[in-house]
Amino acid sequence: MAELACFCYPHLENDSYKFIPFNSLAIKCMLTAKVDKKDQDKFYNSIIYGIAPPPQFKKRYNTNDNSRGMNYETSMFNKVAMLVCEALNSIKVTQSDVASVLSKVVSVRHLENLVLRRENHQDVLFHSKELLLKSVLIAVGHSKEIETTATAEGGEIVFQNAAFTMWRLTYLEHKLMPILDQNFIEYKITVNEDKPVLESHVKELIAELRWQYNKFAVITHGKGHYRVVKYSSVANHADRVYATFKSNNKNGNMLEFNLLDQRIIWQNWYAFTSSMKQGNTLDVCKRLLFQKMKRESNPFKGLSTDRKMDEVSQVGI
């Protein structure tokens, strides 16, 4: 995750802002600079290489002292930064909005995936600039629309029906912020259209999840799509979701946290996110992840008869 201010800076033109991507040498200069505490939140002028991000975001970049940040010296950083600017320059951002826009915390991997979709000649985003920019504005939290299948970050499609598409995420292959754990396996489920879903299509998805992905929990980050993750990584997701939720609220980016369909979401995660929305502390919310929940009445009782036993997946074992 990183703030949009890690990729670009605003330049006032008439009554609105134009966004300009950072270059890697300016960032490198900022990372070595000694800056007064009072100036930590201001864009840094490297004198030679132009404007750099505010020093308060140093930890967002990969250095000798911090291996968890972005690989900002890669060509992928330039591509992501330019794509972000392209999207922001397609809308009007005024002086009253600019701080809020740049403070938004976004998924770096999501943005890299959109670059990969853009470069894929077989992908609809390669052919439609309008859809591409729409996808980026959704990814950076500027649009109130949810991420649907057409505007999704992408990956490898492993399941699809009339209402849902399930993607295997390809973060292991990323350049900007790759997942280093070779055992990483995670999925995302997007709705094909933002409209009510037929019960039969929900039933098809739940049957697929129950039989093929029975070692995984279905959760949500509140953005209108589902994530299918290993139970061992749920606590880590909880920390990230809670931190992003609090950060967005603090910065005035009050986006509605979408709890999604309770029939699909893992019961404990639904309890965690509901508690978070009520304003409880992280410790109080996380306790709900490890409590034994009373089973809800199952609207799809007898669903297991839809599949034969030899279809049970070994994914995640």
UniProtKB/Swiss-Prot annotation:
GO terms for molecular function: ATP binding; metal ion binding; nucleoside diphosphate kinase activity; ribonucleoside triphosphate phosphatase activity; RNA binding. It comes from Rotavirus A (strain RVA/Human/Indonesia/69M/1980/G8P4[10]) (RV-A). Its EC number is 3.6.4.-. Pfam families: Rota_NS35_C (PF02509), Rota_NS35_N (PF21067). It is found in: Host cytoplasm. One of its GO terms (biological process) is viral genome replication. One of its GO terms (cellular component) is host cell cytoplasm. Homooctamer. Interacts with VP1; this interaction is weak. Interacts with NSP5; this interaction leads to up-regulation of NSP5 phosphorylation and formation of viral factories. Interacts with host DCP1A, DCP1B, DDX6, EDC4 and EIF2S1/eIF2-alpha; these interactions are probably part of the sequestration of some host SGs and PBs proteins in viral factories. Belongs to the rotavirus NSP2 family. The keyword Metal-binding applies. Residues 205-241 are annotated as: RNA-binding. Participates in replication and packaging of the viral genome. Plays a crucial role, together with NSP5, in the formation of virus factories (viroplasms), which are large inclusions in the host cytoplasm where replication intermediates are assembled and viral RNA replication takes place. Displays ssRNA binding, NTPase, RNA triphosphatase (RTPase) and ATP-independent helix-unwinding activities. The unwinding activity may prepare and organize plus-strand RNAs for packaging and replication by removing interfering secondary structures. Signal peptide: none annotated. ATP binds at residues 107-109, 188, 221-223, 227. InterPro entries: Rota_NS35_C (IPR048306), Rota_NS35_N (IPR048573), Rotavirus_NSP2 (IPR003668), Rotavirus_NSP2_C (IPR024076), Rotavirus_NSP2_N (IPR024068). Its cofactor is Mg(2+). The active site is at residue 225. This is Non-structural protein 2. Keywords: ATP-binding, Host cytoplasm, Hydrolase, Magnesium, Metal-binding, Nucleotide-binding, RNA-binding. SUPFAM superfamilies: Rotavirus NSP2 fragment, C-terminal domain, Rotavirus NSP2 fragment, N-terminal domain. HAMAP family: ROTA_NSP2.
